[in-house]
């Protein structure tokens, strides 16, 4: 298939991966989203008993633990739970508050998945699913080549948004941990 070139690659087609890909693509970046699974967003699909606990309107930096306490302040000041709620309202997804600011879809988690897919489509995100990454090689110029079972992909940057190992039976893997180790990134 040759080498396909992208400005950014998102690895992991869950909530974080799709949101990141959508935002980058809508800002004019050429983005491809890769996942090893044939079906995207499995954790979204099962969250909240199938109704997706999609945000907590009371989330503050004090709700998060981090080696860098300012990270969460910065992240939440750039994109708040209210910003995500505005996106949900734009798509006319009915929701309700269940407990202490936790918001759930009235109908189905599929509505959030469809919303994120539509946001990716609006930016022209390319998809590679299922696609297994065999190796990540850093180039001399600072870019990367992802060697995959569907051909090599060249990129300036990679976002690893695979989540943790919380639910292996729905496809969670140690991919992010292996990449962190490969590039000597600290794990918390």
Language model features with spans:
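Glycine-rich active-site loop/strand segments that organize a redox cofactor
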Residues: 49-99
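Predominantly flavin-linked oxidoreductase catalytic cores and closely associated redox partners
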Residues: 122-188
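Residue-level detector of alpha-helix initiation sites
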Residues: 10, 14-16, 39, 164-166
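Short beta-strand to alpha-helix junction loop
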Residues: 72-80, 99-118, 165-172
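Glycine-rich FAD pyrophosphate-binding loop
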Residues: 25-49
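Residue-level signal for inorganic ion chemistry
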Residues: 88, 116, 180
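Redox-cofactor binding/interface segments in oxidoreductases and associated redox assembly factors
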Residues: 11, 46, 160-161
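N-terminal Rossmann-like FAD-binding beta1-loop-alpha1 element of flavoenzymes
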Residues: 6-33
């Amino acid at each position: 298939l040759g080498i396909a070139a992208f400005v950014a690659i998102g690895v992991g087609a869950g909530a974080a991966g799709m949101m990141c890909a959508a935002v980058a693509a809508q800002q004019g970046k050429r983005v491809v989203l890769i996942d090893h699974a044939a079906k995207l967003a499995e954790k979204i699909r099962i969250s909240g008993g199938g109704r997706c606990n999609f945000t907590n309107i009371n989330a503050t930096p004090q709700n998060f633990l981090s080696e860098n306490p300012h990270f969460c302040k910065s992240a939440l000041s750039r994109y708040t739970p209210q910003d995500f709620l505005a996106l949900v309202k734009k798509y006319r997804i009915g929701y309700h508050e269940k407990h202490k600011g936790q918001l759930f879809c009235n109908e189905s988690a599929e509505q959030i998945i469809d919303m994120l897919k539509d946001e990716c489509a609006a930016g022209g995100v390319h998809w590679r699913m299922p696609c297994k990454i065999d190796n990540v090689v850093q180039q001399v110029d600072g870019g990367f080549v992802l060697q995959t079972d569907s051909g090599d992909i060249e990129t300036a940057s990679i976002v690893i948004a695979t989540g943790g190992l919380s639910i292996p039976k729905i496809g969670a893997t140690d991919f992010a941990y292996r990449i962190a180790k490969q590039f000597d990134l600290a794990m918390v």
